[in-house]
Amino acid sequence: MCLSSPCPSAAGATTVISVTAIDFEERDLEASVPDLAAGGAWTRVRLRWRRDPLTGASARILTGEKLQPSSRPDLTELTAKPAFCPFDSEYLETATVPFPAELTAEGRIRVGRAVVVPNIMAYATHSAVGIYDPGRHFIDLDEMTPALVGDALTAMVRHAQAVRRVDPAAQWSSINANYLPPAGASLIHPHLQSAHDAHGLTGQRLLVERSRAWKERHGSYWTALVQQEADGPRWVGQIGRVAWLTPFAPTGFGEVWGVVADVADVTELTDDDCRALGQGLSQILAAYRAQNLASFNFGLIGGGPHAHQDGHQVVLKVLSRSNPEPVYRSDATYFERIWGEALIDLSPEEVAEAIRARF
C-alpha cells in the first residue's frame, strides 16, 4: 500500500494497513474547488484523512500549496537582550527563589550549564522551570546542542525524582517546552517547564488509558509501534533506547516522537536516556531551522501511578509552530482548538524523510 502519496483507491474508500496488532486507517477524500489560476474552473483536489490507531484522533493531510515558510523572519529585535530577564545569569540568583532544602540542599539544581528553579506560576502541585543556559539570553534552534538539551532534561528529571521522593502522591509527571511567543512562551530566554501532581494532563491520561486497553487485548502498543515502524517511511532513527519516528496521524506540523524503550515514567529516565533524548531533539531542531522554522513545543510524559502495569512507555512529542512574524497566521484554527482535528500540509512520511538524514 502507498503511504507517502495518495493511494490509488476510489474517493471515500478506506485502506487498512495491518502489521502485527496495529491497523493504520486512512481514507482518500476528493474535493471540488474553483481554481482561480484557471479562471475559476472547477478542479478536483485530493486530501487524506487518517485515524490514530491508539487514540482515535484524526488528521487531514492536505495536498497542493504548502504552508512551509520560504524564508525566515529576522529575530534580531525579538531576541535582543533586554534590560532585565530573570533567567539571565546576572539576575538568576536574585530574581529566582531556591527550592526547599528537602528537595535539594543546593537550592537550585544544576547540570552542566542548565539550572532548574521553582516556577512562580502555579500550573501544578509541583512545577519547575529549567534554563538551558543562563549565560545566553537567546539560543537559536541550530545552536541547541545535544549537551545543552540533554543537560537541561537531566536536571529536570532530577527535580522530578526529588518531587516524587518528598511527595509520593505526585505520580503524574511531564516535562515541556514553549519556545518563542507563537508556542506560548512568555519569556524569550529558552527554558523548559514541568508539572507533577496527582492528576494527569488530559492527553497524558488518554494515552495511558488507551495503552492499558490496548495491552489487555494485544500486548504493548508502544513496543509493537516501534517494531512495526522500524526502517519504514515514518522511521527517523534510533539513539540509545530512544526510537524516533513520525506519527501516522499527527496533531501538529513537523511532529516527531521519541519513544523510550522499557521506561514507563519520567522519574525512571537515566542520564544516558536524557543524553539520547537531547541528541535527537537537537537534530530535529536543527532540521526545523533548515526549513526556515523558528518556534516549537515539546512534551515528555510519564505514565502515572500504574505506568508499567498499564503498558505505557515514556514518549516525547515535538512539533513546530508558526513563525514569529509581526502579523502571522496561527497554526491553531477551529479545526485544532475546537474540534481536535489537525490540518497538516506535509505528510509524516515527508517530515521523516527530511529529518532522517541527520540521524
Language-model regions, residue ranges each:
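Active-site microenvironments that recognize anionic phosphate/pyrophosphate groups
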Residues: 2-189, 195-268, 272, 285-359
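Internal helical hairpin/lid segments
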Residues: 278-286
